Amino acid sequence: MCGIISAISKKNVTNILIEGMKRLEYRGYDSSGLAIINKKKEIIRLRSQGKIKNIINLIHKTKQLIGNIGIAHTRWATHGLALKKNAHPHVSKNIAIVHNGIIENYLNIKTKLQKNGYIFTSDTDTEVIAHLIHYEQNKNNKSLLKTIQTVILKLTGSYSMVIMDRYHPNILIAIRSGSPLLIGLGKQENFISSDQLSLLKITKKFIYLNEGDIAILSHKKITIFNKNSILVHRPIVISNIQNDSITKGHYQHYMKKEIYEQPYAIKNAIRNRITKNEKIQFSELNNNAHALLLKIEHIDIIACGTSYNAGMVSKYWFESLSKISCNVEIASEFCHRKFIVKKNSLLLILSQSGETADSLTALRNSKKHEYLGSLVICNSSSSSLVYESNFSILTNAGIEIGVASTKSFTTQLTILLMIAAKINNLKTNDEKIENKVAKTLRLLPEITKNVLKCDSLIYSLAKELSDKNNIIFIGRGHNYPIAMEGALKLKEISYTHAEAYAAGELKHGPLALVDSSTQIIVIAPNDNLIDKIKLNISEIRTRGGVLHIFSDNLTKFNDNTNVIRLPYDGILLSPIIYVIPLQLLAYYVALIKGKNIDKPRNLAKSVTVE
């Protein structure tokens, strides 16, 4: 969601801040701003609603933004509308601050500060922190560090932030609470950001702050205290992300690029995890993990958005292949209800970023209950979920910039299928299913390449659907969640209203929506449910609904049926295969409608607040 980039150097930091802000755009934002301390020890601040180019234009106009220390922020509105006055940084006399998170008790603090003469110019919770730091600093005459340590004890919520003080222009202070923060290491300069992508042009060396850490940065020194105010040393991590991996290349949008990267992402997901004798192995899982997998009798899967749909698919795999009961729940619901943990249960959390706030809360809450352990599947080795879980498996999908997840979804499914097969072998001591899954997955990268050859057919369908206001997706079995994912993608990217239903539910209500204007996408692979879904197709046809069917080369339909045939006749991999044309469909509908595909309105790539 919101993005932080800050720098302290022997040289002017303005360009570093601007370039960093540009690289944070993919996270989603509606306003932005930056502030520096100049040679006169003045705080110079620029803020703007809308795009970062507005800030760049302001810099060119003022020609005053020169300083060796600065903080910048891209804001996604939570408290207060998307207005200039609510954009960060927020300033209180000598204090300037940027903040990611939500302060839950800000109104109480605000009231007390107003009684002490503080005037608020924004509607945000962040301005409360700035004034509170100033108030405590002047009241107690403490050092900036001691003041901040006092202030955070009075805050309830999440408050990852970076603070600078014009009376102390040689240091930045950063606090990690709730949202991720990392330090970038340079020569005679250091940086703080919420996302390493913002700094990859200037450094590959990073220090990831732990929850509760406070860091003090000068241009040549870094000091870190943990949540207990004890001096600590955090390891330096060298990033292996190549700078060209975060460019669009010859593609118009990141989403299109990432859809087409799926054959290679899946190959990376299975690389070194399938042996020559068709065995599945995860180097991340030690003997303790295998012992845990052997004991589990139930799995609770927790996720949000697209990851939730991946979890829904895997429920079918775990129950059919592993013979383990499985519950899939939205993280934000799981966090705030009383629940019963079944005997010998595993908590399995899915997240693209590994920083999803609701999923983190679910993981932390689960530690109060008697789970055998927690397993996280995500795409970031340095994420909070990986750090706080018992075990983790990386999808190895590569950097995903587009807000709508594509290759993260298919690699999650790939890993989940492998886990289901592995558990089957561990529990039954029979390698047949594991061998079959391993052998089939070897073919998956090539199959996905062939599926992408349907691109022009999908574009033609998108042209037909681009002016439609309502679209229904239906599927059965493990392809019902793929219908859900197809509808979600269309909503996210093209802003077209779409709903997904289990096909058998049509006659229980949704069939009332069907008439000659109703567009219905049907997922109909040649599996054991094909006759059932053909009955659903007949129900729709007799009511005049307009059908668009995705199927294989074996399944026969009436001659006048609009069918897009995919080059896969199997059953096991159909969820992974059939979602790819639905991703393309959402992309092309959005393209034809002229939408901002990589940065859809009101959405963020990494949802780091509840």
From Swiss-Prot:
Q: What does the record give as EC number? A: 2.6.1.16
Gene Ontology CC, one term: cytosol
- Which residues does the UniProt record annotate as the domain SIS? 289-429, 461-600
The GO biological-process annotations, alphabetized, read as: carbohydrate metabolic process; fructose 6-phosphate metabolic process; protein N-linked glycosylation; UDP-N-acetylglucosamine metabolic process
* Main localization of the protein described in the UniProt heading: cytoplasm
Q: Where in the cell is it found?
A: Cytoplasm
Catalyzed reactions per annotation: D-fructose 6-phosphate + L-glutamine = D-glucosamine 6-phosphate + L-glutamate
Enzyme class comes to transferase
State the active site.
C2 (nucleophile), K605 (for fru-6p isomerization activity)
Q: Which residues form the Glutamine amidotransferase type-2 domain?
A: 2-220
Query: Which NCBIfam families does the annotation name?
Result: glmS, PRK00331.1
Molecular function via GO: carbohydrate derivative binding; glutamine-fructose-6-phosphate transaminase (isomerizing) activity
Q: Which organism is it from?
A: Buchnera aphidicola subsp. Baizongia pistaciae (strain Bp)
Keywords of the record, alphabetical order, are: Aminotransferase, Cytoplasm, Glutamine amidotransferase, Repeat, Transferase
Q: What's the protein called, per UniProt?
A: Glutamine--fructose-6-phosphate aminotransferase [isomerizing]
Q: List the gene name.
A: glmS
- Top-rank taxon of the source lineage equals Bacteria
* Subunit organization: Homodimer.
State what this protein does.
Answer: Catalyzes the first step in hexosamine metabolism, converting fructose-6P into glucosamine-6P using glutamine as a nitrogen source.
